[in-house]
């Protein structure tokens, strides 16, 4: 039997993780371990100064008082009876495209699985109303089965974004590169009830690089976007130039 570890960053009670677990359970044994609260934007953060605690829920899910990366690390090292065949993170409530991937706890949970030597994918539902989690769950299951039958290189994860459309309205699947956004808009300054100044992060930047071949473009056309992401962040095409640069310092 196939063993799958599922996690997310929206929290253990999120609709997306419930739909994902249900879809994958049709052909695999699934362990779902996720944060006990919403951890959107947690990126690859780990909890280093406090202990992690687990709470076994009535539906079989495991809630952890930690980050998405904590959840995957803890599950693989301590909670899984057998090592998972694959880690699946999602289904995120909202897209993770372009620059979003650097901040995403959804992507980070998948990356943590890859750090520990396992195939991994991150899945997000791209849209505003977020009505069609079942569509994302359907394509998640399809992609997972494909990965298990035909594994990819070990230094990558797949970042999957699914349009918020009925299954029959999806035009297909496109392999894409990450697009990019303009810089984020300014902070929102306001006051708390006591009159003290507080700040909220402003809206994300508008799409800057959203042309043909990008994840933004695929989603806008009604296609599922699959972007391979590498764990190695080295800019190899800059190494020679940097070698020259340090000689003239």
Curated annotation (Swiss-Prot):
Gene Ontology MF terms in the entry = 3'-nucleotidase activity; 5'-nucleotidase activity; exopolyphosphatase activity; metal ion binding; nucleotide binding
Broadest EC class? Answer: hydrolase
Q: Where in the cell is it found?
A: Cytoplasm
> Which residues bind a divalent metal cation per the record?
9-10, 40, 92
Relate the protein's function as given in its record.
Answer: Nucleotidase that shows phosphatase activity on nucleoside 5'-monophosphates.
The GO cellular component terms are: cytoplasm
Q: In its UniProt entry, what is this protein called?
A: 5'-nucleotidase SurE
Catalysed conversion reaction = a ribonucleoside 5'-phosphate + H2O = a ribonucleoside + phosphate
The cofactor binding remark recorded in the entry reads: Binds 1 divalent metal cation per subunit.
One Pfam family, please name it. SurE
Q: Which family does it belong to?
A: Belongs to the SurE nucleotidase family.
Q: What is its main location?
A: cytoplasm
- Keyword presence, Hydrolase: yes
Cofactor needs: a divalent metal cation
What organism, scientifically named, is this protein from?
Shewanella denitrificans (strain OS217 / ATCC BAA-1090 / DSM 15013)
**Any idea of its EC number?**
3.1.3.5
InterPro entries assigned: SurE, SurE-like_Pase/nucleotidase, SurE-like_sf
Domain of life here? Bacteria
Q: In its keyword annotation, does this UniProt entry include Signal?
A: no
The protein's matches in Gene3D superfamilies, at most eight in alphabetical order, are given as: Survival protein SurE-like phosphatase/nucleotidase
Q: Which UniProt keywords apply?
A: Cytoplasm, Hydrolase, Metal-binding, Nucleotide-binding
């Amino acid at each position: 039997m196939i063993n799958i570890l599922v996690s997310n960053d929206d929290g253990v009670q999120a609709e997306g993780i419930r739909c994902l677990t249900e879809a994958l359970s049709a052909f695999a044994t699934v362990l779902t371990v996720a944060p006990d609260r919403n951890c959107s934007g947690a990126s690859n953060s780990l909890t280093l100064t406090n202990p992690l605690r687990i709470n076994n829920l009535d539906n079989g899910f495991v809630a952890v008082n930690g980050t998405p990366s904590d959840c995957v690390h803890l599950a693989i090292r301590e909670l899984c009876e057998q090592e998972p065949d694959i880690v699946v993170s999602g289904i995120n409530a909202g897209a993770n495209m372009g620059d979003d991937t650097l901040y995403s706890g959804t992507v980070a949970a998948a990356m943590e699985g890859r750090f520990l030597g396992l195939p991994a994918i991150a899945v997000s539902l791209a849209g505003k109303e977020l009505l069609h989690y079942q569509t994302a769950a359907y394509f998640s299951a399809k992609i997972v089965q494909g990965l298990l039958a035909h594994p990819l290189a070990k230094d990558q994860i797949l970042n999957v974004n699914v349009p918020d459309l009925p299954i029959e309205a999806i035009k297909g699947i496109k392999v894409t590169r990450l697009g990019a956004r303009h810089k984020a808009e300014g902070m929102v300054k306001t006051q708390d009830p006591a009159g003290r100044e507080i700040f909220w992060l402003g809206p994300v930047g508008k799409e800057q690089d959203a042309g043909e071949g990008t994840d933004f473009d695929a989603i806008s056309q009604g296609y599922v976007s699959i972007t391979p992401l590498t764990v190695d962040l080295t800019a190899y095409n800059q190494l020679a130039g940097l070698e020259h640069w340090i000689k003239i310092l």
